[in-house]
Amino acid sequence: MPRLPFLASTCLGALALAAAPEPRFERRTITTDFFSEGCAVGDLNGDGRPDIVAGPHWYAGPEFRLRHTFAANPGRPYDPLGYSESFVQLVADLNGDGKPDVITVGFPGKETYWYENPGAPGTAPWKRHLFLASTDNESPHLVDLDGDGRPYLVCMSGGAVGYAKLNPLDPTQPAKFVPVSPAEPKKYQRFTHGLGVGDLNGDGIPDILERSGWWEHPAATAPLDTQWKFHPMAFSAGRNGGAQMIVTDVDGDGLPDVLTSLDAHRFGLSWFQQKRTPEGITFVEHRILDDKPENSAGGFALGQMHALVLSRQIVAGQPALVTGKRFWAHGPKGDVNPQATPLVLWLTWAKDAEGKVVFNPRVADTEAGIGTQFEVADLDGDGRAEIVVANKKGLHVLSSAR
């Protein structure tokens, strides 16, 4: 993405902001060290205040000045020309002791570990347990698939789409991966892009989405090894797949739609409008952002949208999609326009006079960029969300103000 379209886009965004007061964001850099391309938020020390996890460290809220090391680390930051061993980080109580633990999904195709929160403060590394020996796809999700309150790691492994769930009787043992699809190693490999979880058919049970379609969750009474039904749908036609695929009702018709980037290393952001026909569920694509300003909402030709989050705390009572440009995904010479402005954007949408859904993107930041996963959460209890990003530029908090 050349810088010129961004400058034009900034002017358009300024006009929109002048019309009505909206959140603006101020960047605070916690560290410029590169330890992770994902991050998580949770109250790790039990003081009632959210803390931040990034790489082998956690930062105590609300100031995030005090850095604790909970995992073995390389002893120095990773080189931004290369990669870290932390692509996605998640927080959940995995052993039922009431304390949030940390899950680190490593480099694609490698191990996912979870770190047991000891509760009491200390300097010793937390106990590390293997969650899954090989985690494929670059956007795994941690969700409750069956309503029992325990999280599943939805990912790909062994050439198949599926999930891994720890044994509640002994969560320190590695999880068993349960495939929901046949094994297709060439299709579902370590660097596969695009993955989502959501109830697409309205039966109250989450389904799994990927770039070539969606897998329908069978009835809750079905045996564990039941293969899920596949519904083909090109969510990234002619492209390589995006990142986190979001299920939400965009147009207000009561049917779940899909928001997704089309190529995590190039261009494209679309929403897929769900339609019901006698033959079943279909989707109609509506492009939001693309490789040319004239084809993009607000004139933003934004590339490398390698992470997406849907939040209802940016604008009260209204959903907002947060995304941005992954900084140096493949170094300073890889991908398309690797040196383009590392924007972080947030987008809201509404219907115009003709009933068409129109997206309105605004700039949250021009320096931080994103990684492969990030968090949007209220860190200070003021009811407004902060955007927390970790990537090759370090760890940053974008705080909203009015």
What name fits each language-model region?
Residues M1-C11:
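Bacterial N-terminal signal peptides that target proteins for export
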Residues A18-R402:
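Beta-propeller-forming repeat regions
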Residues T10-A20:
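Hydrophobic h-region of N-terminal signal peptides that target proteins for export
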